[in-house]
Amino acid sequence: MRLKETIEAYRRNDPAARSGWEVFWLYNGLHATMYYRVAHWLYEHRLRFLGRWVSQFARRRTGIEIHPAAKIGRRLVIDHGTGIVIGETAEIGDDCLLYQNVTLGGTGMTNGKRHPTLGNNVMVGSGAKVLGPFKVGDNARIAANSVVLREVPPNATVVGVPGRVVRRNGEKLDHIHTPDPVRLELDALYARIEKLEEKLKEDQDVSL
């Protein structure tokens, strides 16, 4: 892991990070990924028990559980790192951002690929669950508390339970300013009511 570039990624994504030293000493998310790199190396070199031991030690220290077999790219940022779960066959690209209580989980008890693959520059908002062996495309945004159960195209924004795509223009969003799915449904309902009222008025004018 290139530690310096990862620390810089934290500083870019978190306005509260005042210095690189602060990130290095105080950020649980960074510590969890450092432990993961050690655990993953052990796991890849057939020292699987030791790899699992390191990952469980890291879970107790940081509150973040990353299976040592998971594949994680460069400059991963875990902000407010508590309650993160990253499963055994999960894959994460470069420059991704995860907030607290995110789960990259599997479905079922089958062998083989069970967990999601995140592309590059993917943001997953707090409390979101991404469950299953599918791809989340580059530059995708998943809103807080969404539950995503199927593939997400690149440059898309997903909200809701179950998650659905509401934007595909690649506009930069964060986990606070993603669209409210209830508001979107209400706006659509109001638009339908207005159309019905206009049609009703037209029908009344014709009958007169």
Kindly label every feature range from the protein language model.
Residues 1-62, 173-208:
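Terminal amphipathic alpha-helical/low-complexity segments used for targeting or macromolecular assembly
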Residues 59-166:
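Structural signal for interior beta-strand "rungs" in well-ordered beta-sheet cores
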Residues 168-172:
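A structural signal for small-residue-enriched, beta-sheet-centric alpha/beta enzyme cores
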